[in-house]
């Protein structure tokens, strides 16, 4: 970890990504099983390096394989053709394990069987022409590179950059920085991943009250790259306007952006990230460039049991928030019809915000 002075003159801290001693032991264990893990394209291997690394005290949340699979499943359900098209490009803007890239590679490897029959040519094409990623630190970069490319030493790994896009996201310069690093303006059809959630401001004590949300910046910058599909997992507190550091204007824009096609919402973050508390829960969503319509909203509770679902606009009844309790929607609509002034953005969000 390290401290630095931000553009606003305040001291800020970036915590360690890992507990050093635990991480070193884990890496040794990883190299013992490296050969076993190298072939992620064939067979049903469910392990990866993060099975050997305990949860870390950091704002870098590593995505479990099960969650990665659910997100890529959503992509495949909604747009199966992208995994059969050898021109489709994918990027993870904040790769922390390589799981998104390898899961996509697996789907492409199957989907392109007819287009590129030779397996060696197929994987070379996928890794060189279709998959891209940015890893935020040297240690993560080497780990992702080893996981994604180690089984294919003949494949060029230049599509994976050692690049932390946090500052670029804060400055609204992600597109420009990517163009500089790749040597040309890039076009990505699909952006997927788990962006950083917050940046600690102040001293190194890790005072959570000083934490400023930054995930919304990655969502905005991803949209500016104009992909056909955007799939990310983020905290859910924006839905009820109960998060610090996210402008009201950003929340308004997202609530009224009818290109968000699907949201899976988990009020208990442990259902996605075991042992990690994220107040208000987490959600993953699918945004589609050419979609304009209602959002299919799914609420998961009780260890991922699907309890509620609804198809409607995010800004239901112009409430200014996402009504996470689907059963309340009909009641709210009845109240709105009787007394339209009763529900205002400020008072209503205060009434139904989750208790943290």
Task: Kindly label every feature range from the protein language model.
Residues 58, 269-356:
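C-terminal substrate-recognition regions of SAM-dependent nucleic acid methyltransferases
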Residues 1-262, 268-272, 281, 288-294:
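SAM-dependent methyltransferase catalytic region
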């Amino acid at each position: 970890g390290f401290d630095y002075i931000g553009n606003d003159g305040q001291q800020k801290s970036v915590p360690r990504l890992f507990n050093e001693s635990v991480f070193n032991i884990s890496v040794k264990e990883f190299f013992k099983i490296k050969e076993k893990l190298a072939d992620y394209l064939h067979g049903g291997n469910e392990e990866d390096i993060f099975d050997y690394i305990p949860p870390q005290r950091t704002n870098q949340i590593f995505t479990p394989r099960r969650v990665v699979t659910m997100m890529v499943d959503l992509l495949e359900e909604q747009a199966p053709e992208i995994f059969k098209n050898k021109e489709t490009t994918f990027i993870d803007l904040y790769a922390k394990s390589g799981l998104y890239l390898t899961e996509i590679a697996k789907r492409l490897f199957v989907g392109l069987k007819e287009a590129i029959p030779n397996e060696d040519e197929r994987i070379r094409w996928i890794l060189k022409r279709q998959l891209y990623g940015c890893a935020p630190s040297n240690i993560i970069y080497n780990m992702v590179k080893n996981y994604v490319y180690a089984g294919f030493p003949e494949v060029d790994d230049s599509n994976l950059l050692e690049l932390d896009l946090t500052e670029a996201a804060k400055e609204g310069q992600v597109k420009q920085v990517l163009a500089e690093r790749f040597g040309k303006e890039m076009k990505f059809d699909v952006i997927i991943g788990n962006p950083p959630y917050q940046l600690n401001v102040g001293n190194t004590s890790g005072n959570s009250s000083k934490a400023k949300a930054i995930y919304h910046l990655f969502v905005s910058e991803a949209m500016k790259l104009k992909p056909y599909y955007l799939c990310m997992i983020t905290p859910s507190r924006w839905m009820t306007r109960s998060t610090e550091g996210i402008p009201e204007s950003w929340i308004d824009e997202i609530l009224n952006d009818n290109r968000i096609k699907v949201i899976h919402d988990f009020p208990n973050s442990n259902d996605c990230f075991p042992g990690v508390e994220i107040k208000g829960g987490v959600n993953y969503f699918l945004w589609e460039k050419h979609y304009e319509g209602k959002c299919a909203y799914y609420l998961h509770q009780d260890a991922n049991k699907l309890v509620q679902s609804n198809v409607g606009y995010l800004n239901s009844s112009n409430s200014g928030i996402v009504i996470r309790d689907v059963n309340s929607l009909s009641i709210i609509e009845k109240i709105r019809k009787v007394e339209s002034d009763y529900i205002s953005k400020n008072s209503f969000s205060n009434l139904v915000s989750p208790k943290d």
